Amino acid sequence: MSLFVASRSAFRAAAPLKRQFQIRRYATEPPSADAKKGNNTLLYGAAAAAVAGAGYYFLGGTPAAKKAEEKVKDASSAAAGKLSTSEVKQALTGGEQGWVSLKLEEVEIVNHNSKRLRFRLPEDDMVSGVHVASAILTKFKPVDAEKPVIRPYTPTNDEDARGYLDLLVKKYPNGPMSTHLHDMVPGQRLDVKGPLPKYPWTANKHGHIALVAGGTGITPMFQLCRAIFNNPDDQTKVTLVFGNVREDDILLKKELAALENNNPRRFRAFYVLDDPPKHWTGGKGFITKDLLKTVLPEPKDENIKVFVCGPPGMMDAISGNKKSPKDQGELKGILKELGYSPEQVYKF
């Protein structure tokens, strides 16, 4: 039985890493059920909208009702054929637009040091305008400071979501922006600008991609994964290696587990912890050369891409850091030692 079929746990770490590493290649996958749906997408999307709408009517006015309402909007967008963002109004258009003020609507505590912040877009029928593998800039000016603090963040909401933009923010001890965002309460506003294009993704651009992430570096990876698996025409295979300090530091773990369970033959995830609990059966310590050599697609496979995103120390060890947002810098570290070329690696 396939490893992917046999394991349906929330964490890939439920199976010992030694067992996981026995399988490097994916089995040939037949056309997915989604690819066979064809015109049923409209029917199912409309049905989803109707169900979500019924839930909203029943819940009327409660916090859960707001989430149901968002599902109605998103399902309706899908039922309408998922219009491209060029065909709907975009909140962030880049260029000469300048900064846009967004109101914080909702705050969700994710774990001991991370929050999900939902900001309302200027109009309810707008999409953010942030495409796959893109980011935004955030800005605020501390009291008595001469200059504002500006930091990039990758939104985690679907690019087709209407009326809102979500940021997943980890608070760092000496991080002025992350501290400011964690201190915000609903009703306050944040200046944002974008989108900032990173990697120009298109369906089936690569046959297999590998994602090496650390901490909040998972956000652009998740954005990319969701776009791939939400598109029935995109048959890209994905391998994720995700490093964190402790188990409760693993961000988006439920969402990643759902993607893995729904796409067991095209998506596998490996988790590594610096400070694992006693019951942990996944990787321990740092992301190592042996681990990457075992689970990543081989560099001799031409139609692959390895994406890397994480704290500076991890980036330095895995691929070398970027010189600037527009300069990828020299390829160094483990990936170079394993034989990957600069053209096969992208640093977020």
Curated annotation (Swiss-Prot):
- Required cofactor(s): FAD
Topology relative to the lipid bilayer, per the entry, is:
Single-pass membrane protein
A Gene Ontology biological process term:
ergosterol biosynthetic process
Q: Which family does it belong to?
A: Belongs to the flavoprotein pyridine nucleotide cytochrome reductase family.
**Gene responsible for this protein:** MCR1
Give the originating organism.
Chaetomium globosum (strain ATCC 6205 / CBS 148.51 / DSM 1962 / NBRC 6347 / NRRL 1970)
Gene Ontology CC annotation, any one: mitochondrial outer membrane
* Record-listed E.C. numbers: 1.6.2.2
The entry's FAD-binding residues are: 205-240
Q: Which residues cross the membrane?
A: 41-61
Gene Ontology molecular function, alphabetical: cytochrome-b5 reductase activity, acting on NAD(P)H
- Reaction equations catalysed: 2 Fe(III)-[cytochrome b5] + NADH = 2 Fe(II)-[cytochrome b5] + NAD(+) + H(+)
Q: What is this protein called?
A: NADH-cytochrome b5 reductase 2
Which InterPro entries did the record assign? CBR-like (IPR001834), Cbr1-like_FAD-bd_dom (IPR008333), FAD-bd_FR_type (IPR017927), Flavoprot_Pyr_Nucl_cyt_Rdtase (IPR001709), FNR_nucleotide-bd (IPR039261), OxRdtase_FAD/NAD-bd (IPR001433), Riboflavin_synthase-like_b-brl (IPR017938)
